[in-house]
Amino acid sequence: MSTHANHPFHLVDYSPWPLTGAIGAMTTVSGLVQWFHQYTMTLFILGNVITILTMYQWWRDISREGTFQGLHTFPVTIGLRWGMILFIVSEVFFFISFFWAFFHSSLSPTIELGMTWPPVGIAAFNPFQIPLLNTAILLASGVTVTWAHHALMEGNHSQATQGLFFTIVLGVYFTILQAYEYIEAPFTIADAVYGSTFYMATGFHGLHVLIGTTFLLICFLRHINYHFSKNHHFGFEAAAWYWHFVDVVWLFLYITIYWWGS
C-alpha cells in the first residue's frame, strides 16, 4: 500500500524493531529467571543489550518520521495521544494487581505469618528515612518537568532545557537511592509474602523510573537539537505524562507499603 496517498494519516513502513524488541524482552525475562536459579547473568545482559539497541533505533526512526519527514500530522498526534493514555491506563491496572496482592496479605495476615503485619522476623524500613527523601525527590521532579513543559509551550528554550536537565538528575538520584536501599535491606524477595510484594511493587516502579528517565533523556537530546516547537512536541508531552504517572504510583507505594505497611 502506498504511503503517499492523499490523506493525513501515517501508514508506517515495515520495521524490524517490534520483532527485535519482543526478542529482547523475552531474552531479558528468561535471563532473569536463569539469574535467580543458576546465578549467571549472561542471558540477562544479552537481553538488555538487544532491548537497548532496539529502543535506540526505534526512537531514531520515530524522530526522523515526526521531525524531518513531517509524518506526525495533527490527526496522527491525536491517535498517538489516545495510544499513550490507554497505555498509562493499562499500567495503572498492572500496579493495581500488586496493591491487591499486598492488601490481600496485610489486611488479614494468616497464622503462617504470625497473624501480624509485617510478618514475624521482618524488619520493615523506617518510612521517614530514605523512602521520605525519595518521595520529596519525585515530587520535586514533577515540578521541574512541569516547569520544562510550560517553558517549552512559551518558546523559552533555555528554561525548558534546565527543567528537563534537573528532572533527569532527580530521576537518576532516585534510582541510586533505591538501589542503596535494596543493598542495605534486612530482608530479601524470598522472605515471606512481605518480601515478595515489597520487591515486586517497588522493583517494577523502579523499572518504570528507569524507563521514564530514559524517555526524558531522549527528549532532552531532541530538545537541544531543536526538534520541538511550541505547537509540536508530543514526544515531550508523552514523557511528562508518563513521569507524572510514576510520581502518583510512588505516592501510593509510600503511603501503603512503606508507611501504613510498616
Swiss-Prot record:
SUPFAM superfamilies: Cytochrome c oxidase subunit III-like (SSF81452). The chain crosses the membrane at residues 39-59, 83-103, 120-140, 163-183, 201-221, 240-260. Keywords: Membrane, Mitochondrion, Mitochondrion inner membrane, Translocase, Transmembrane, Transmembrane helix. Coiled coil: none annotated. It comes from the Eukaryota. Its EC number is 7.1.1.9. One of its GO terms (biological process) is mitochondrial electron transport, cytochrome c to oxygen. It is a multi-pass membrane protein. GO terms for cellular component: mitochondrial inner membrane; mitochondrion. Its main location: mitochondrion. GO terms for molecular function: cytochrome-c oxidase activity. It holds the Pfam family COX3. It catalyses: 4 Fe(II)-[cytochrome c] + O2 + 8 H(+)(in) = 4 Fe(III)-[cytochrome c] + 2 H2O + 4 H(+)(out). CDD domains: Cyt_c_Oxidase_III (cd01665). It is found in: Mitochondrion inner membrane. Component of the cytochrome c oxidase, the last enzyme in the mitochondrial electron transport chain which drives oxidative phosphorylation. The respiratory chain contains 3 multisubunit complexes succinate dehydrogenase (complex II, CII), ubiquinol-cytochrome c oxidoreductase (cytochrome b-c1 complex, complex III, CIII) and cytochrome c oxidase (complex IV, CIV), that cooperate to transfer electrons derived from NADH and succinate to molecular oxygen, creating an electrochemical gradient over the inner membrane that drives transmembrane transport and the ATP synthase. PANTHER family: CYTOCHROME C OXIDASE SUBUNIT 3, CYTOCHROME C OXIDASE SUBUNIT III. Component of the cytochrome c oxidase (complex IV, CIV), a multisubunit enzyme composed of a catalytic core of 3 subunits and several supernumerary subunits. The complex exists as a monomer or a dimer and forms supercomplexes (SCs) in the inner mitochondrial membrane with ubiquinol-cytochrome c oxidoreductase (cytochrome b-c1 complex, complex III, CIII). Belongs to the cytochrome c oxidase subunit 3 family. This is Cytochrome c oxidase subunit 3.
